[in-house]
Amino acid sequence: MAKLNTPKGKLVRKLGVNIFGNPKFDRLLSKKGYGPGQHGKSGKRFSTYSVQLQEKQKIKFTYGMLEKQFRNYFEKASQMKGETGLNLLVMLESRLDNVIYKLGFAPTRPAARQLVSHGHFLVNNKKVN
């Protein structure tokens, strides 16, 4: 499984939201409220496509997924009955690594994902990775 090697601070400044939940990034956003790079963010208006893309990227980075995995979840959610966005959110929140993070067994989502992939948790008395 591939992972992102982008510095987290740069990613947080680019998105403008602390998606990792670390207080360090809250301080970073309060000190530097502009985007990364030499000139920061420009004052131009964003198109609807760019806003949708940025929201999708926030979700992907929050849950630590790549594009193909996210697309598969979206397709499953769109085939289910009900609202697609709500179904997608329910599916993402019910992933084992997210549940372990929410229960407090791991300090971060990537740490929870590592614990799951190393087989430290049993589901119905079977190792799950």
Go through each PLM region and give its residues.
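Ferredoxin-like alpha/beta domains used as RNA- or RNAP-binding modules
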Residues: 1-103, 126-129
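A contiguous pocket-lining binding segment that forms or flanks enzyme active sites
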Residues: 111-129
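Beta-rich strand-turn-strand
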Residues: 106-109
